[in-house]
């Protein structure tokens, strides 16, 4: 599994002015003899953006070359794939913690707003619930949250409770596409995103509709989610980083409405708050006033263990961990007023700079833990794997080939 060479050629190209210096510092403090190179092909170890990794070299050299990302993992990071992963796993493991910790969801597929009715015919249970909502008082309605499958940073997320409200959301997205030559648009990989947080339907196609958790736990009257960092190594050990963040919505919490102007009280993605995020919006989980923190941490640990096992054992085409790869995932959780923990989503290449300056030591500690646990052991002659004290094992599996 290891290289006998003392000198390790390292290729770092993270293209993030917040994270990359911390990555390099963690590597230099590893105690290993390193030579930094500009060639991914020549490197023994690649810590770079996904599109900059030479995966051919990773495949050809499973014992001597390591990289910071799995090649295939959409069973976890695509929203509708994650939902399928969970329901497939629960069919065989109905007693899993995932049965109560993943909000019920429905998948919609459409190219244009005019095809919503056809898509709802497939999701007939959702359609029935939305029709029932139309006859209820606003206080009695079940609310839903619409999430474009391939978008991140909260792009395109909306709240709704009826078919009419959902149709209006998709109509507004279609309007954005027709006005794209006049409006300012930004390219996000293969996805075009408007600066007003709208998206172009035809470039997305797949959407996930989740039941909205209507009674979230609040901090200072503001909704928040927990950002946990997860390290997956080889095939397959999964660790939860002990230091977690609470990311707070900009505005005080209000009851759900379809008004997009009130989204800032419901969406706790701090990236929506611009470059000058208030430090009060980003907090160290362990230093908050949240009760039952140990129980919440344990629930998160168990959820992570089961969801990675679900992907690894039921989605062999869409999650293929390799022994000479590791990856850091940003996993988001919501806690309700009864301390029930819900899994929201799994993110590849999480936006570390959301942590900000005041809590940057958390990211520094994370990278140090990754170096100690995922990188140094790979290049050591000993088969013993060191595990940093800031990591807690969530799941260990032995996977060989396709499942």
Curated annotation (Swiss-Prot):
Upper taxonomic lineage: Eukaryota, Fungi, Dikarya, Ascomycota, Taphrinomycotina
Catalytic reaction list: C-terminal L-alpha-aminoacyl-L-glutamyl-L-glutamyl-[tubulin] + L-tyrosine + ATP = C-terminal L-alpha-aminoacyl-L-glutamyl-L-glutamyl-L-tyrosyl-[tubulin] + ADP + phosphate + H(+)
Top class in the EC scheme: ligase
Compartment annotation: Cytoplasm; Nucleus
One GO CC term on file: cytosol
Listed name of the protein: Probable tubulin--tyrosine ligase C12B10.04
Pfam family name, one: TTL
Chief location of this protein within or outside the cell: cytoplasm
The family this protein is said to belong to: Belongs to the tubulin--tyrosine ligase family.
TTL domain ranges (all copies): 9-386
Transmembrane region(s): none
Biological processes annotated in GO: protein modification process
UniProt xrefs under InterPro entries: TTL, TTL/TTLL_fam
Gene3D superfamilies for this protein: ATP-grasp fold, B domain (3.30.470.20)
GO molecular function list: tubulin-tyrosine ligase activity
Annotated keywords: Cytoplasm, Ligase, Magnesium, Nucleus, Potassium
Species for this entry: Schizosaccharomyces pombe (strain 972 / ATCC 24843)
Keyword RNA-binding among record annotations: no
Enzyme Commission number(s) of this protein: 6.3.2.25
């Amino acid at each position: 599994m290891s290289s006998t060479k003392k000198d390790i050629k390292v290729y770092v190209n993270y293209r993030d002015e917040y994270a990359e210096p911390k990555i390099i510092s963690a590597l230099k403090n590893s105690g290993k003899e390193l030579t930094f190179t500009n060639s991914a092909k020549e490197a023994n170890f690649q810590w770079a953006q996904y599109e900059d990794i030479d995966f051919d070299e990773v495949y050809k050299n499973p014992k001597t070359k390591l990289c910071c990302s799995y090649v295939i993992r959409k069973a976890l990071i695509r929203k509708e794939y994650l939902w399928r992963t969970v329901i497939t796993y629960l069919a065989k493991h109905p007693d899993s913690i995932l049965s109560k910790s993943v909000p019920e969801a429905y998948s919609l597929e459409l190219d244009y707003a005019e095809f919503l009715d056809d898509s709802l015919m497939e999701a007939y249970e959702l359609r029935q619930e939305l029709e029932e909502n139309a006859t209820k008082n606003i206080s009695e309605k079940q609310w839903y949250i619409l999430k474009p499958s391939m978008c991140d940073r909260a792009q395109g997320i909306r709240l709704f409770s009826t078919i009419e409200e959902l149709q209006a959301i998709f109509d507004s997205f279609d309007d954005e596409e027709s006005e794209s030559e006049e409006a300012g648009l930004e390219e996000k990989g293969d996805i075009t995103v408007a600066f007003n947080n709208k998206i172009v339907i035809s470039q997305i196609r797949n959407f996930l509709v989740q039941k909205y958790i209507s009674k979230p736990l609040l901090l200072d009257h503001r909704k928040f989610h927990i950002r946990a960092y997860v390290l997956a190594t080889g095939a397959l050990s999964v660790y939860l980083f002990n230091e977690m963040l609470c990311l707070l919505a900009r505005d005080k919490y209000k009851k759900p409405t379809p008004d997009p102007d009130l989204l800032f009280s419901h969406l706790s993605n701090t990236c929506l708050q611009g470059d000058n995020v208030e430090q009060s919006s980003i907090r160290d989980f362990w230093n908050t006033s949240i009760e039952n923190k140990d129980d919440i941490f344990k629930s998160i640990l168990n959820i992570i263990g089961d969801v990675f096992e679900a992907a690894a054992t039921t989605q062999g085409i869409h999650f293929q961990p390799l022994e000479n790869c590791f990856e850091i995932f940003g996993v988001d959780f919501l806690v309700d007023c009864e301390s029930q923990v819900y899994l929201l989503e799994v993110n590849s290449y999480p936006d570390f700079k959301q942590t900000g300056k005041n809590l940057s030591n958390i990211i520094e500690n994370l990278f140090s833990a990754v170096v100690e646990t995922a990188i140094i052991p790979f290049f050591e002659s000993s088969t013993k794997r060191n595990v940093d004290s800031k990591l807690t094992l969530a799941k260990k599996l032995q996977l060989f080939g396709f499942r």
